[in-house]
Amino acid sequence: MFRFVNRGVNRRDLLKQGLTAGAILALPGRALAQAVTDPLTSEFDRAFAGAAQTQAPAALVEAAPPVPVYDPAYNRCLVDIARRELGRAGAKVWRNDIVGIADFARSSSQPRFHFVNMESGVIRSFLVAHGRGSDPQHDGWLKSFSNTPGSEATSRGAYLTCEWYKGKYGTSIRLEGMDSDNYNALNRAIVMHPAPYVDPSMAAHWGKIGRSEGCFAMSQGDFNEALWHLSGGRLLYADRIV
């Protein structure tokens, strides 16, 4: 069990004051989007190195149909985790209708980012990338978590979803790490954003999707679901779900 870390930021008040018209512009002078600088060496990376970053507004890109999770026992586990983490977070999270759970025990080719509706019990699942530092061989499986700056790895634990901002990949969502294993999220620029290297066709063809630098990267269409249903003071939890 991770402990929540008090970072001394009243994020709830900040979000309440700043979330107007459903979107927030970036704070000036602060760019938290990722920049891919490492040389591309694998066959997969060479094939998709030239993929253009989408310039279309997120709202104009249609999401792929979410993939439901049919395993009743797994569904119950997700709901139990969502309830547990909401209870652990308490007043730090001020929108508890939907909880995002990223299950990094699954391959990146599988829809493993689960949006749990706490009111209806409906669970919708999407593709999400993990960090390249968590998967150096790029075989599609997360090997380790890290909270260390420069690791380019995914961090486990509970996050508070914050405001929207404009970055390299367009509209993105800031994240505040609330655990001892992810408290560097803001400093590491760990965010949620769309990316051209996350796509169902890539997963089907290669058995994996691309890697981020630690961010929760989604396909452009799926990311619309995150913008409207997971941002603005909700809970995101990342771990290996057994």
Language model feature labels by segment:
Residues F2-G22:
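N-terminal secretory signal peptides and thylakoid transit peptides that target proteins
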Residues A31-A33:
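Boundary at the C-terminal end of the N-terminal hydrophobic targeting segment
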Residues A35-T37:
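Glycine-rich, aromatic-bearing surface loops/beta-hairpins
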Residues P39-S212, Q220-N224, W228:
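Cell wall/extracellular polymer interaction/catalysis modules
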Residues C215:
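Short cysteine clusters
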Residues H229-V242:
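A short beta-strand-loop micro-motif that forms or neighbors metal/cofactor-
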